[in-house]
C-alpha cells in the first residue's frame, strides 16, 4: 500500500489540513480543491491510489461528494466502487455511511468528527458565522439587542459567551435543568425550550441551534415582524 495521503474535496478546512500534513513532511495529494489552491493537485485516478483517503465534512451533500471548491461533480455511488478494502478512509459525519460501506463494498470508514475536541473546534467558526449573518441581516447593532439562543449545545454555549461580550441582552433556552442553572450562572436569562410560548415576541434576534423543529408556525407568529431568525 502506498503511503500517500489523498485529500478529496471539502472546503478550506481540508485545504488547511492538506497544507499542514505537507508541512509535517508527509506525501500528500489533493483533488477537488482547486478553487482553494489545494496543494499538489492530482487526477482523481492518482488520488484514489493513496493508502489513506481523507474525505470532507460532511462527506456527502445531496448524494454527491461534498465539493464546494470545484465545478466538478462526483456522485458518491460512483466513488465507493473505486476505493479499496485495504485503504484507510476518514470522513466527517459518517453515521449513515459507515455501516453500508462495510456491507456493500467492504470499506472501513472512520469518522474524525466523532471526536469531541473536533466538534468543539468546528463550533467556533459556526458560531462566528452566525454572528456575521446576524449583523448582515439587521440594521441594528448586536449591542443592546434582545437575543435568544435556542439550545445549549456546543454552538449555543459559544454564542452564550459571544453575545453578552458584545453587549447583547441574551436569553438561552435549554431542556435540562442543569443547563438552565449554568445559563443563569453565566449571567444569561434561562428559558425552558418546551415553554417558549409567550416569550418570543420580545426578541430582536433568535439563534436556533437545535437540529429539529422548535419554531413551528404558531411560534413564528409570536415573533416581531422585524425579528431576524437564524
Whereabouts are the PLM-identified features?
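Glycine-rich adenosine-cofactor-binding loop
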Residues: 6-16, 21, 143-164
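Conserved mixed alpha/beta catalytic, RNA-binding, or beta-rich assembly cores of soluble enzyme
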Residues: 56, 112-115, 136, 157, ...
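Rossmann-like adenosine-cofactor binding region
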Residues: 58-61, 73-86, 183-230
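Residues in the short beta-alpha loop(s) of Rossmann-like NAD(P)-binding domains
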Residues: 11, 34, 93-95, 175-176
